[in-house]
């Protein structure tokens, strides 16, 4: 994960604990989780919209070709 080992992750967690305190950590984790969830939801929506437009595109081309014949 990002080229970090176990010792580096523990050190980062200790620094975060010192900076924000034990009281704020659950709030920070909750906010981070919500942000990641929202990002994934938006990413999925964009992907679905892209796939839908790609699926509709050949149908439009076939309809245009058929009407020209």
UniProtKB/Swiss-Prot annotation:
GO cellular component, one term: TAT protein transport complex
Pfam families for this protein: TatA_B_E
GO biological process annotation, one example: protein transport by the Tat complex
Subcellular location: Cell inner membrane
Keyword entries, A-Z: Cell inner membrane, Cell membrane, Membrane, Protein transport, Translocation, Transmembrane, Transmembrane helix, Transport
InterPro entries according to UniProt: TatA/B/E, TatA/E
Transmembrane segments: 1-21
Gene3D superfamilies with a match to the protein in the record: 1.20.5.3310
Highest taxon listed in the record's lineage: Bacteria
Biological role stated in the UniProt entry: Part of the twin-arginine translocation (Tat) system that transports large folded proteins containing a characteristic twin-arginine motif in their signal peptide across membranes. TatA could form the protein-conducting channel of the Tat system.
Quaternary organization: Forms a complex with TatC.
Record protein name field: Sec-independent protein translocase protein TatA
Species: Chlorobium chlorochromatii (strain CaD3)
Gene that specifies this protein: tatA
């Amino acid at each position: 994960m990002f080229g970090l080992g176990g010792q580096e992750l523990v050190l980062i967690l200790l620094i975060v604990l010192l900076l924000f305190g034990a009281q704020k950590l659950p709030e920070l984790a909750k906010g981070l989780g919500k942000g990641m969830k929202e990002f994934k939801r938006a990413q999925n929506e964009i992907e679905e919209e892209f796939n839908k437009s790609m699926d509709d595109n050949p149908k439009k081309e076939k309809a245009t070709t058929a009407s020209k014949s």
